[in-house]
């Protein structure tokens, strides 16, 4: 699967399970590089815009690997990617 399609699928899956993704340039003085947080009961994943697509796929896969995805159909290639990220 092309990296762009892979990332789009991961992004759609995150939204489907209630994770909003916000893109921010974190290359300044912050030590954070991307991550999941919970604000007022809602999940928010802050993605560093300075990360390349391969790293974004890795980061979002790691995030999703920690979530309960039971009962959600995920195409095999994406499910394998998420499983390998654990």
Regions found by a protein language model. Give the residues of each.
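Anionic group-transfer/hydrolysis microenvironments
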Residues: 26, 50, 64
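C-terminal structural segments of small proteins and small subunits
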Residues: 60-85
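Active-site scaffold of zinc-dependent metalloenzymes
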Residues: 31-54
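Auxiliary, metal-adjacent structural segments of Zn-dependent hydrolase domains
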Residues: 1-32, 39
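Solvent-exposed, non-transmembrane amphipathic alpha-helical segments
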Residues: 9, 30, 34, 41, ...
């Amino acid at each position: 699967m092309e990296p762009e399609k892979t990332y789009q699928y991961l992004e759609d899956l995150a939204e489907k399970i209630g994770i909003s993704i916000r893109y921010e340039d974190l290359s300044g003085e912050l030590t954070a590089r991307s991550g999941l947080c919970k604000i007022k009961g809602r999940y928010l994943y802050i993605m560093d815009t300075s990360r390349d697509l391969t790293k974004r796929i890795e980061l979002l896969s790691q995030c999703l690997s920690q979530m309960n995805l039971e009962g959600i159909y995920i195409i095999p290639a994406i499910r394998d990617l998420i499983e390998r990220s654990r």
